A protein has these predicted regions:
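N-terminal leader/targeting and pre-domain segments
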Residues: 2-18, 104-106
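Local sequence-structure signature of Cys/Sec-based thiol-disulfide redox active-site neighborhoods
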Residues: 10-46
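Generic recognition of short, well-ordered alpha-helical segments
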Residues: 33-36, 64, 68
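Non-catalytic interaction surface on structured domains
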Residues: 38, 48-50, 79, 93
């Protein structure tokens, strides 16, 4: 296998292990803006396998998330195996910074 192919395969494996949790609420304009940027970022071909979970902090079953982030949404957790704590993005999202974090190796 060529070195380029090996790098692409390794990057693909890294991206498959990235999981995202997007904490939001329906009445939040910042959340809507962040969601648009997140969706646009995830449309890139190399992010097609990234897992995204959206958590509406206003739903009763998400009360722990509400207690933690009621004044801080939107919040995005970037998790991957071997990482002790998620990387967090809060309030304003930047497409280039998100993409760089999704591609980062731990």
């Amino acid at each position: 296998m060529k070195a380029t192919s090996l790098r692409l395969l390794a990057r693909s494996n890294i991206l498959q292990q990235v999981s995202l949790t997007f904490f939001t609420k329906e009445t939040c304009q910042l959340c809507k803006n962040a969601g648009v940027i997140l969706d646009k970022t995830l449309q890139a071909k190399d992010f097609s396998n990234v897992k995204l979970k959206t958590v509406d902090i206003m739903k009763p079953e998400n009360s722990a998330a509400f207690d933690k982030y009621c004044y801080d949404v939107p919040v995005l957790h970037v998790d991957r195996p071997g990482q002790k704590k998620p990387v967090k993005f809060m309030h304003y999202f930047d497409e280039e910074k998100l993409a760089a974090e999704f591609r980062r190796e731990v």
